[in-house]
């Protein structure tokens, strides 16, 4: 068994990010963006406009990044900061971007450090608008955004609909949340990928099999592994459809999420999307058994004498029964959760269900798997290879899984 594994690397790690902040009430969110990027391993250089400093201070960003914030076009030693920032950046993100800054950027204005940095860089640029609804929907703003996107190839991320500044009603113009902007930056850093515009289907979470209107049987799957995979696939440019059982996780940003309850509902949804999928990842912990006759009313203990017996029926094996519905030359990945004979049982599933590889892990590990942010897995391949992946976050495990999928895509047109 191989103990070497495909080294995971999230797109932000070791990269240089220039984070521009302009004068919007949403500027306070940029501090959280800078903190998260730094924790993900990025070197973050912040550039604050005069307007931004009316809302946030440079010292706040320096405190979370450990790096100086820039505000003036020229540094103390008279070096041209806009040149050095632009040349050294792997990505430039402006969050928030006001209507005024968007207008000046579309015209190629260069009257402050941030606008000149945009002109000096060859790195991808992400613009995150934040403004009043009327300002956002104004035809001139829409023309400016369209020009940035279509003519300059900037990524315009957002805005979203939500609460705006005090005294304003809810509307379109709210800046994306920090974690969503982090994903947009990650996507920009990835750039071109074999998964770009491919359709990826992911199943995640448990299923619930109803006994009566208030009771059900299920399992302890949190859905974190599947959600992390879906987000990683989206970051690589894929069109992702996530079919998930009941979990306490928000929909992953940019992912088409379909929520179901039972194994039957998941089966129906998978059958609908599978023929279109270039990559299918069966990560859900589907209940093996359900109930043929679900009580229409709550079962009461007072109405039953003696033992309470429930008749179980076998649920369909979704990955096996939809095998012939897979798109030609598509890639299929399975999961195997076991309490014994991990490799033997996983190998059996790999062969019976004709997966391109399978991700196996034990159900009885306290520091991994169920109810944990981490996982320890073994990847098994049809040619007999086994790859042990040591304990790491599920986000990093998802990067390893996607790395193997990218390798497989190289050999499939």
What are these regions (language model features)?
Residues 1-126, 132-337, 341-413:
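A cross-family phosphate/adenosyl-ligand binding-site feature
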């Amino acid at each position: 068994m191989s103990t070497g594994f495909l080294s995971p690397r999230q797109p932000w790690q070791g990269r240089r990010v220039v984070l521009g902040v302009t004068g919007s009430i949403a500027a306070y969110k940029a501090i959280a963006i800078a903190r998260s990027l730094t924790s993900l391993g990025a070197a973050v250089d912040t550039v604050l406009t005069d307007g931004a400093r009316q809302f946030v201070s440079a010292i706040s960003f320096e405190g979370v990044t450990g790096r100086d914030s820039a505000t003036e076009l020229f540094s103390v030693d008279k070096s041209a900061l806009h040149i050095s920032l632009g040349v050294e950046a792997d990505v430039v993100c402006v969050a928030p971007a006001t209507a005024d800054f968007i207008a000046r950027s579309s015209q190629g204005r260069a009257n402050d450090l941030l606008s000149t940095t945009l002109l000096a860089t060859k790195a991808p640029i992400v613009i995150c608008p934040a403004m009043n609804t009327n300002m956002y929907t104004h035809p001139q703003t829409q023309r400016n955004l369209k020009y940035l996107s279509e003519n300059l190839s900037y990524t315009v991320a957002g805005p979203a609909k939500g609460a705006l500044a005090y005294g304003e009603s809810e509307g379109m113009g709210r800046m994306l949340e920090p974690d969503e902007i982090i994903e947009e930056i990650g996507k920009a850093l990835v750039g071109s990928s074999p998964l770009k515009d491919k359709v990826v289907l992911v199943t995640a979470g448990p299923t619930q099999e109803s006994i009566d209107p208030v009771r059900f049987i299920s399992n302890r799957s949190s859905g974190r592994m599947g959600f992390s995979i879906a987000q990683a696939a989206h970051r690589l440019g894929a069109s992702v459809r996530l079919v998930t059982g009941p979990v306490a996780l928000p929909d992953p940003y940019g992912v088409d999420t379909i929520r179901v309850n039972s194994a039957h509902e998941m089966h129906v949804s998978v059958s609908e999307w599978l023929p279109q999928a270039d990559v299918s990842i069966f990560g859900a912990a589907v209940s093996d058994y359900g109930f043929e006759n679900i009580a229409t009313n709550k079962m009461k203990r007072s109405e039953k004498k003696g033992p309470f017996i429930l008749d179980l029926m076998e649920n369909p094996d979704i990955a096996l029964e939809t095998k012939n519905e897979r798109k030609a030359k598509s890639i299929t990945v399975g999961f195997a959760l076991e309490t014994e004979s991990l490799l033997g049982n996983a190998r059996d599933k790999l062969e019976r269900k004709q997966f391109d590889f399978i991700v196996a892990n034990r159900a009885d590990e306290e520091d991994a798997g169920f109810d944990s942010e981490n996982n320890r897995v073994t990847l098994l391949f049809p040619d007999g290879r086994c790859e042990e992946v040591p304990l790491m976050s599920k986000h990093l495990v998802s990067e390893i899984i996607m790395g193997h999928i990218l390798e497989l895509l190289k050999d499939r047109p």
